[in-house]
């Protein structure tokens, strides 16, 4: 697990 993966996940959610 990398922080970048979590960041990308959060960005995807907030980008909706």
Swiss-Prot record:
GO MF annotation, one: carbohydrate binding
Signal peptide, first to last residue: none
Record keywords, A-Z: Lectin, Secreted
Subcellular location: Secreted
Recorded GO CC terms: extracellular region
Induction: By infection.
Superkingdom assignment: Eukaryota
Tissue: Hemolymph.
Task performed by this protein: Binds and precipitates antigens of the parasite Echinostoma paraensei.
Name of this chain's protein: Hemolymph 65 kDa lectin BG05
Species annotation: Biomphalaria glabrata (Bloodfluke planorb)
């Amino acid at each position: 697990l990398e922080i970048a993966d979590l960041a990308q996940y959060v960005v995807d959610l907030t980008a909706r």
